[in-house]
Amino acid sequence: MTQVAAIGTYLPPWTVRERRVKGPDEDALTMAVAAGRAADPDATAHRVVLVTRDFPLLEGGNGAVLLAGLSLTADVAVSEVLGGAPAVLDQILGATDGTLVIATDDSATVTAAAAVLIGAEGAGGAGLEPVARQTRSLPTTVRAEDGTRHSYGDPRLQREIGVKSTVVRLGLADTQTVVAVVGAKARDIDAGGAIEDPNSSASGVIRALAAVIENRQAGGLLLAVEQSSVTAAKLTWDDGTQAPWIARDEAQARELPTFRTADGTGIPISLPAYARAFEPKLRWEAAVFDERPGIDTAPQFPPRARVAEDGGLVTDYRLEPLPRTGTVYTQTTIRIPVPDLPSPYSIAVIQLDGSPVRVLMKVTGVPAGEATIGQAGSVVLRKIADRAGVPDYGYAFWPETAEGGVHP
Protein backbone atom coordinates (compact mmCIF):
# COMPACT_ATOMS: atom_id res chain seq x y z
CA MET A 1 0.00 0.00 0.00
CA THR A 2 1.22 3.50 -0.86
CA GLN A 3 1.13 5.93 2.05
CA VAL A 4 0.29 9.58 1.31
CA ALA A 5 2.37 11.87 3.54
CA ALA A 6 1.68 15.29 2.02
CA ILE A 7 -0.05 16.95 -0.92
CA GLY A 8 0.69 20.28 -2.57
CA THR A 9 -1.33 22.05 -5.25
CA TYR A 10 -0.74 25.12 -7.41
CA LEU A 11 -3.02 27.27 -9.54
CA PRO A 12 -1.75 30.28 -11.51
CA PRO A 13 -3.20 33.60 -10.32
CA TRP A 14 -4.66 34.56 -13.71
CA THR A 15 -7.94 33.89 -15.52
CA VAL A 16 -9.31 34.42 -19.01
CA ARG A 17 -13.09 34.16 -19.22
CA GLU A 18 -13.20 32.60 -15.74
CA ARG A 19 -10.71 29.85 -16.60
CA ARG A 20 -7.33 29.68 -14.89
CA VAL A 21 -4.47 30.38 -17.29
CA LYS A 22 -0.72 30.69 -16.88
CA GLY A 23 1.12 33.99 -16.92
CA PRO A 24 3.62 34.81 -19.69
CA ASP A 25 6.47 33.76 -17.39
CA GLU A 26 5.01 30.37 -16.44
CA ASP A 27 5.03 26.92 -18.01
CA ALA A 28 4.50 23.31 -16.95
CA LEU A 29 7.89 23.21 -15.21
CA THR A 30 7.50 26.36 -13.09
CA MET A 31 4.05 25.17 -12.01
CA ALA A 32 5.47 21.73 -11.16
CA VAL A 33 8.10 23.35 -8.94
CA ALA A 34 5.44 25.41 -7.14
CA ALA A 35 3.35 22.32 -6.39
CA GLY A 36 6.40 20.28 -5.43
CA ARG A 37 7.65 22.89 -2.98
CA ALA A 38 4.18 23.07 -1.43
CA ALA A 39 4.18 19.29 -0.84
CA ASP A 40 7.83 19.03 0.22
CA PRO A 41 8.95 22.41 1.61
CA ASP A 42 11.87 20.86 3.50
CA ALA A 43 13.28 19.15 0.37
CA THR A 44 13.23 15.63 1.84
CA ALA A 45 12.42 13.68 -1.34
CA HIS A 46 15.04 11.25 -2.65
CA ARG A 47 13.28 10.55 -5.96
CA VAL A 48 11.12 12.75 -8.21
CA VAL A 49 8.62 11.67 -10.86
CA LEU A 50 7.21 14.34 -13.19
CA VAL A 51 4.08 13.33 -15.12
CA THR A 52 2.66 15.55 -17.86
CA ARG A 53 1.78 15.73 -21.53
CA ASP A 54 3.18 19.25 -21.78
CA PHE A 55 6.94 19.06 -21.22
CA PRO A 56 8.66 22.37 -22.04
CA LEU A 57 11.54 20.41 -23.57
CA LEU A 58 11.30 17.01 -25.23
CA GLU A 59 15.08 17.05 -25.71
CA GLY A 60 17.52 18.94 -23.57
CA GLY A 61 16.06 17.83 -20.26
CA ASN A 62 13.83 19.39 -17.63
CA GLY A 63 15.22 17.48 -14.66
CA ALA A 64 18.07 19.81 -13.68
CA VAL A 65 15.81 22.86 -13.46
CA LEU A 66 13.19 20.81 -11.60
CA LEU A 67 15.66 19.62 -8.96
CA ALA A 68 17.19 23.07 -8.54
CA GLY A 69 13.77 24.67 -8.14
CA LEU A 70 12.84 22.07 -5.51
CA SER A 71 16.13 22.64 -3.62
CA LEU A 72 17.07 18.99 -4.17
CA THR A 73 20.62 17.88 -4.93
CA ALA A 74 21.67 16.99 -8.45
CA ASP A 75 22.11 13.30 -7.55
CA VAL A 76 18.38 12.80 -6.85
CA ALA A 77 16.82 10.51 -9.47
CA VAL A 78 14.31 12.18 -11.81
CA SER A 79 11.86 10.37 -14.10
CA GLU A 80 9.92 12.25 -16.76
CA VAL A 81 6.73 10.34 -17.60
CA LEU A 82 4.53 11.26 -20.55
CA GLY A 83 0.93 10.67 -19.51
CA GLY A 84 -2.32 11.91 -18.05
CA ALA A 85 -4.63 10.98 -15.20
CA PRO A 86 -4.19 7.15 -15.23
CA ALA A 87 -0.40 7.51 -15.51
CA VAL A 88 -0.31 9.76 -12.45
CA LEU A 89 -2.30 7.30 -10.35
CA ASP A 90 -0.11 4.43 -11.57
CA GLN A 91 3.05 6.33 -10.58
CA ILE A 92 1.66 7.07 -7.12
CA LEU A 93 0.65 3.44 -6.60
CA GLY A 94 4.12 2.24 -7.59
CA ALA A 95 6.07 4.86 -5.64
CA THR A 96 8.22 4.12 -2.60
CA ASP A 97 8.85 6.07 0.59
CA GLY A 98 10.41 9.47 -0.13
CA THR A 99 9.20 9.75 -3.71
CA LEU A 100 7.72 13.05 -4.85
CA VAL A 101 5.20 12.53 -7.67
CA ILE A 102 4.37 15.77 -9.49
CA ALA A 103 1.62 16.14 -12.08
CA THR A 104 1.37 19.29 -14.18
CA ASP A 105 -0.88 20.49 -17.00
CA ASP A 106 -0.32 23.30 -19.47
CA SER A 107 -3.07 22.70 -22.01
CA ALA A 108 -6.00 24.51 -23.56
CA THR A 109 -8.37 23.03 -20.96
CA VAL A 110 -6.36 22.74 -17.73
CA THR A 111 -3.52 24.84 -16.32
CA ALA A 112 -2.48 23.59 -12.89
CA ALA A 113 -0.07 21.39 -10.97
CA ALA A 114 -0.21 19.11 -7.93
CA ALA A 115 2.22 16.88 -6.06
CA VAL A 116 2.18 13.97 -3.62
CA LEU A 117 4.98 13.10 -1.21
CA ILE A 118 4.99 9.40 -0.39
CA GLY A 119 5.55 8.40 3.24
CA ALA A 120 6.72 5.24 4.94
CA GLU A 121 4.45 2.22 4.68
CA GLY A 122 2.50 1.64 7.86
CA ALA A 123 2.89 5.23 9.02
CA GLY A 124 -0.89 5.65 9.10
CA GLY A 125 -3.11 8.31 7.62
CA ALA A 126 -4.32 7.87 4.05
CA GLY A 127 -3.24 4.92 1.95
CA LEU A 128 -3.78 3.94 -1.68
CA GLU A 129 -3.73 0.45 -3.13
CA PRO A 130 -4.35 -0.69 -6.72
CA VAL A 131 -7.71 -2.22 -7.56
CA ALA A 132 -7.99 -2.55 -11.33
CA ARG A 133 -6.66 -1.13 -14.57
CA GLN A 134 -7.74 -1.12 -18.20
CA THR A 135 -5.67 0.37 -21.03
CA ARG A 136 -7.65 0.60 -24.27
CA SER A 137 -7.46 2.64 -27.47
CA LEU A 138 -10.08 5.19 -28.49
CA PRO A 139 -8.08 8.18 -29.76
CA THR A 140 -10.83 10.78 -29.77
CA THR A 141 -8.13 13.41 -29.26
CA VAL A 142 -4.64 13.06 -30.68
CA ARG A 143 -1.58 15.27 -30.84
CA ALA A 144 0.94 14.62 -33.60
CA GLU A 145 4.72 14.87 -33.48
CA ASP A 146 4.57 18.42 -34.86
CA GLY A 147 2.12 19.47 -32.15
CA THR A 148 -0.94 19.43 -34.38
CA ARG A 149 -4.04 18.43 -32.43
CA HIS A 150 -6.99 16.53 -33.91
CA SER A 151 -10.32 15.94 -32.16
CA TYR A 152 -12.90 13.41 -33.29
CA GLY A 153 -15.61 15.46 -31.62
CA ASP A 154 -18.08 12.77 -30.51
CA PRO A 155 -18.88 13.17 -26.79
CA ARG A 156 -21.39 10.32 -26.88
CA LEU A 157 -18.78 7.91 -28.27
CA GLN A 158 -16.34 9.00 -25.57
CA ARG A 159 -18.95 8.55 -22.85
CA GLU A 160 -20.41 5.20 -23.94
CA ILE A 161 -17.36 3.41 -25.38
CA GLY A 162 -14.48 5.29 -23.81
CA VAL A 163 -15.78 5.56 -20.26
CA LYS A 164 -18.77 3.34 -19.51
CA SER A 165 -17.64 0.19 -21.30
CA THR A 166 -14.11 0.50 -19.91
CA VAL A 167 -15.36 0.92 -16.34
CA VAL A 168 -17.49 -2.22 -16.81
CA ARG A 169 -14.34 -4.12 -17.78
CA LEU A 170 -12.75 -3.16 -14.47
CA GLY A 171 -15.11 -5.63 -12.80
CA LEU A 172 -15.68 -3.47 -9.74
CA ALA A 173 -17.93 -4.93 -7.06
CA ASP A 174 -21.24 -3.22 -6.36
CA THR A 175 -20.17 -2.82 -2.75
CA GLN A 176 -17.20 -0.65 -3.72
CA THR A 177 -18.09 3.04 -3.47
CA VAL A 178 -16.53 5.54 -5.87
CA VAL A 179 -15.55 8.66 -3.89
CA ALA A 180 -13.81 10.57 -6.70
CA VAL A 181 -13.55 10.39 -10.48
CA VAL A 182 -11.32 12.41 -12.80
CA GLY A 183 -11.85 12.54 -16.55
CA ALA A 184 -15.57 11.70 -16.53
CA LYS A 185 -18.80 12.83 -14.95
CA ALA A 186 -19.79 10.93 -11.83
CA ARG A 187 -23.28 10.23 -13.17
CA ASP A 188 -21.81 8.52 -16.25
CA ILE A 189 -20.50 5.72 -14.04
CA ASP A 190 -23.39 5.69 -11.55
CA ALA A 191 -21.30 7.34 -8.85
CA GLY A 192 -23.67 9.99 -7.61
CA GLY A 193 -22.21 12.05 -4.79
CA ALA A 194 -18.60 11.39 -5.78
CA ILE A 195 -16.15 14.26 -6.18
CA GLU A 196 -15.76 14.78 -9.92
CA ASP A 197 -13.53 16.59 -12.38
CA PRO A 198 -14.89 15.93 -15.89
CA ASN A 199 -11.72 17.32 -17.51
CA SER A 200 -9.13 14.60 -17.74
CA SER A 201 -5.85 16.00 -16.48
CA ALA A 202 -2.70 14.83 -14.76
CA SER A 203 -2.99 17.23 -11.83
CA GLY A 204 -6.71 16.56 -11.43
CA VAL A 205 -6.04 13.15 -9.86
CA ILE A 206 -4.03 14.61 -7.00
CA ARG A 207 -6.44 17.49 -6.55
CA ALA A 208 -9.34 15.03 -6.28
CA LEU A 209 -7.38 12.98 -3.75
CA ALA A 210 -6.77 16.13 -1.72
CA ALA A 211 -10.47 17.01 -1.80
CA VAL A 212 -11.45 13.55 -0.50
CA ILE A 213 -8.91 13.80 2.32
CA GLU A 214 -9.98 17.33 3.27
CA ASN A 215 -13.63 16.23 3.38
CA ARG A 216 -12.66 13.27 5.59
CA GLN A 217 -14.81 11.03 3.44
CA ALA A 218 -14.94 7.34 4.17
CA GLY A 219 -12.55 5.23 2.15
CA GLY A 220 -13.57 4.31 -1.37
CA LEU A 221 -12.43 4.18 -4.97
CA LEU A 222 -10.59 6.85 -6.91
CA LEU A 223 -10.96 6.52 -10.70
CA ALA A 224 -8.58 8.17 -13.17
CA VAL A 225 -9.93 8.27 -16.74
CA GLU A 226 -8.24 9.38 -19.96
CA GLN A 227 -10.12 8.66 -23.20
CA SER A 228 -10.60 4.87 -22.87
CA SER A 229 -7.97 4.06 -20.24
CA VAL A 230 -8.92 3.82 -16.56
CA THR A 231 -6.98 3.13 -13.37
CA ALA A 232 -8.84 2.46 -10.11
CA ALA A 233 -7.31 2.70 -6.64
CA LYS A 234 -8.76 2.20 -3.18
CA LEU A 235 -8.32 4.94 -0.60
CA THR A 236 -8.19 3.71 2.99
CA TRP A 237 -8.02 5.50 6.31
CA ASP A 238 -6.11 4.48 9.42
CA ASP A 239 -8.36 5.75 12.20
CA GLY A 240 -6.68 7.64 14.99
CA THR A 241 -3.76 8.90 12.90
CA GLN A 242 -3.18 12.34 11.48
CA ALA A 243 -4.41 13.05 7.96
CA PRO A 244 -1.83 13.91 5.29
CA TRP A 245 -0.68 17.51 5.29
CA ILE A 246 -2.22 19.50 2.42
CA ALA A 247 -0.78 22.83 1.24
CA ARG A 248 -2.51 24.86 -1.46
CA ASP A 249 -0.60 27.56 -3.33
CA GLU A 250 -3.72 29.00 -4.93
CA ALA A 251 -3.93 32.77 -4.97
CA GLN A 252 -7.26 34.40 -5.71
CA ALA A 253 -7.63 34.67 -9.48
CA ARG A 254 -7.43 37.95 -11.37
CA GLU A 255 -8.00 38.78 -15.03
CA LEU A 256 -4.83 38.28 -17.08
CA PRO A 257 -3.47 41.70 -18.13
CA THR A 258 -2.84 42.52 -21.78
CA PHE A 259 0.78 42.16 -22.91
CA ARG A 260 2.68 43.14 -26.03
CA THR A 261 5.95 41.79 -27.39
CA ALA A 262 7.97 43.77 -29.91
CA ASP A 263 9.15 42.23 -33.16
CA GLY A 264 12.83 41.61 -33.54
CA THR A 265 15.64 39.48 -32.18
CA GLY A 266 15.99 39.21 -28.44
CA ILE A 267 19.12 38.62 -26.42
CA PRO A 268 20.83 35.47 -27.82
CA ILE A 269 21.76 32.68 -25.45
CA SER A 270 25.36 31.83 -24.61
CA LEU A 271 25.45 28.24 -23.40
CA PRO A 272 28.90 28.61 -21.74
CA ALA A 273 27.52 31.55 -19.72
CA TYR A 274 24.32 29.59 -19.07
CA ALA A 275 26.34 26.67 -17.69
CA ARG A 276 28.47 28.91 -15.45
CA ALA A 277 25.44 30.66 -13.97
CA PHE A 278 23.10 27.68 -13.67
CA GLU A 279 23.95 26.38 -10.20
CA PRO A 280 23.93 29.63 -8.19
CA LYS A 281 21.09 31.18 -10.21
CA LEU A 282 18.67 28.25 -10.19
CA ARG A 283 19.66 26.90 -6.78
CA TRP A 284 19.38 30.40 -5.31
CA GLU A 285 22.74 30.34 -3.52
CA ALA A 286 25.26 32.99 -2.55
CA ALA A 287 29.02 32.74 -2.11
CA VAL A 288 30.31 33.02 1.47
CA PHE A 289 34.05 33.49 2.10
CA ASP A 290 36.03 32.75 5.24
CA GLU A 291 37.01 36.02 6.88
CA ARG A 292 40.50 37.29 6.13
CA PRO A 293 42.13 40.73 5.75
CA GLY A 294 40.15 42.66 3.15
CA ILE A 295 37.37 40.06 2.88
CA ASP A 296 34.35 39.73 5.16
CA THR A 297 31.78 36.95 5.47
CA ALA A 298 28.90 38.83 3.83
CA PRO A 299 27.20 36.63 1.20
CA GLN A 300 27.91 37.56 -2.42
CA PHE A 301 25.25 37.13 -5.09
CA PRO A 302 25.86 36.25 -7.81
CA PRO A 303 28.90 34.31 -6.56
CA ARG A 304 32.19 35.83 -7.65
CA ALA A 305 35.87 35.96 -6.77
CA ARG A 306 37.11 38.64 -4.37
CA VAL A 307 40.41 40.45 -3.91
CA ALA A 308 42.16 40.18 -0.53
CA GLU A 309 44.04 42.98 1.19
CA ASP A 310 47.36 41.72 -0.23
CA GLY A 311 45.99 41.91 -3.79
CA GLY A 312 45.53 38.17 -4.18
CA LEU A 313 42.50 36.80 -6.00
CA VAL A 314 40.43 34.60 -3.66
CA THR A 315 38.18 32.00 -5.29
CA ASP A 316 37.63 29.59 -2.40
CA TYR A 317 34.10 30.01 -1.08
CA ARG A 318 31.14 27.91 -0.05
CA LEU A 319 27.60 28.22 -1.39
CA GLU A 320 24.76 28.86 1.05
CA PRO A 321 21.02 29.09 0.29
CA LEU A 322 19.48 32.54 0.15
CA PRO A 323 16.18 33.43 1.83
CA ARG A 324 13.09 33.05 -0.37
CA THR A 325 11.20 35.96 1.15
CA GLY A 326 11.89 39.67 1.08
CA THR A 327 10.52 43.17 0.60
CA VAL A 328 10.57 45.68 -2.24
CA TYR A 329 13.46 48.13 -1.73
CA THR A 330 12.72 50.08 -4.91
CA GLN A 331 10.89 49.34 -8.16
CA THR A 332 10.03 50.63 -11.61
CA THR A 333 7.88 49.57 -14.57
CA ILE A 334 8.97 49.14 -18.19
CA ARG A 335 6.15 49.85 -20.60
CA ILE A 336 8.00 49.99 -23.94
CA PRO A 337 7.66 46.61 -25.72
CA VAL A 338 10.95 44.79 -26.33
CA PRO A 339 11.71 41.51 -28.14
CA ASP A 340 11.32 38.29 -26.11
CA LEU A 341 9.77 40.05 -23.09
CA PRO A 342 5.99 40.56 -22.82
CA SER A 343 5.42 44.15 -21.74
CA PRO A 344 4.61 46.02 -19.60
CA TYR A 345 6.50 44.46 -16.71
CA SER A 346 7.93 45.64 -13.42
CA ILE A 347 11.37 45.09 -11.98
CA ALA A 348 12.35 45.61 -8.36
CA VAL A 349 15.36 45.55 -6.08
CA ILE A 350 14.43 43.07 -3.34
CA GLN A 351 15.88 43.20 0.15
CA LEU A 352 16.00 39.55 1.21
CA ASP A 353 14.77 38.81 4.73
CA GLY A 354 17.52 38.20 7.27
CA SER A 355 20.27 38.85 4.72
CA PRO A 356 22.30 41.84 3.54
CA VAL A 357 21.76 40.74 -0.07
CA ARG A 358 19.63 42.81 -2.42
CA VAL A 359 18.66 41.33 -5.78
CA LEU A 360 17.25 42.88 -8.95
CA MET A 361 14.27 40.75 -10.06
CA LYS A 362 11.22 40.85 -12.27
CA VAL A 363 7.89 41.11 -10.49
CA THR A 364 5.33 38.36 -11.09
CA GLY A 365 1.82 37.44 -9.99
CA VAL A 366 0.44 41.01 -10.01
CA PRO A 367 -0.22 43.54 -12.79
CA ALA A 368 2.74 45.70 -13.80
CA GLY A 369 3.10 48.79 -11.62
CA GLU A 370 1.13 47.42 -8.68
CA ALA A 371 4.06 46.48 -6.42
CA THR A 372 4.98 49.12 -3.85
CA ILE A 373 8.09 49.92 -1.83
CA GLY A 374 8.13 47.97 1.43
CA GLN A 375 5.74 45.30 0.15
CA ALA A 376 6.61 41.80 1.34
CA GLY A 377 6.57 38.74 -0.87
CA SER A 378 8.22 35.53 -2.04
CA VAL A 379 10.95 34.49 -4.45
CA VAL A 380 9.51 32.00 -6.98
CA LEU A 381 10.81 30.17 -10.05
CA ARG A 382 9.76 31.67 -13.37
CA LYS A 383 10.67 31.48 -17.04
CA ILE A 384 12.49 34.75 -17.66
CA ALA A 385 12.63 34.41 -21.45
CA ASP A 386 12.97 32.03 -24.38
CA ARG A 387 16.39 32.49 -25.93
CA ALA A 388 17.02 30.75 -29.26
CA GLY A 389 14.38 28.19 -28.29
CA VAL A 390 15.91 27.49 -24.87
CA PRO A 391 13.78 28.35 -21.82
CA ASP A 392 15.86 30.62 -19.59
CA TYR A 393 14.64 30.09 -16.03
CA GLY A 394 15.34 32.29 -13.05
CA TYR A 395 13.64 33.78 -10.03
CA ALA A 396 11.01 36.49 -9.79
CA PHE A 397 9.39 38.29 -6.88
CA TRP A 398 5.72 37.61 -6.10
CA PRO A 399 4.38 40.38 -3.83
CA GLU A 400 2.14 39.33 -1.00
CA THR A 401 -1.40 40.64 -1.45
CA ALA A 402 -4.57 40.56 0.61
CA GLU A 403 -5.88 37.78 -1.65
CA GLY A 404 -2.89 35.46 -1.24
CA GLY A 405 -0.06 34.98 1.22
CA VAL A 406 3.56 33.98 0.96
CA HIS A 407 4.33 31.25 -1.57
CA PRO A 408 6.60 28.26 -0.79
Predicted feature residues:
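Condensing-enzyme catalytic core mediating Claisen C-C bond formation in acyl metabolism
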Residues: M1-T30, A108-R169, A173, R216-L271
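Conserved catalytic cysteine-centered active-site region
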Residues: K22-E26, T30, D54-G98, A186-A211
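Phosphate/pyrophosphate-binding loops at sites that engage ATP/ADP/AMP, CoA/4′-phosphopantetheine
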Residues: A35-R47, E160-V178
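Cys/His-rich short segments
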Residues: G264-T330
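Short, conserved beta-turn/loop elements at beta-strand boundaries and strand-helix junctions
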Residues: Q331-P337
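OB-fold (S1/OB) nucleic-acid-binding surfaces
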Residues: D340-V359
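Short nucleic-acid-contacting surface segments enriched for D/E, G, S/T with interspersed K/R
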Residues: T364-V379
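OB-fold/S1-family single-stranded nucleic acid-binding modules
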Residues: V380-P408
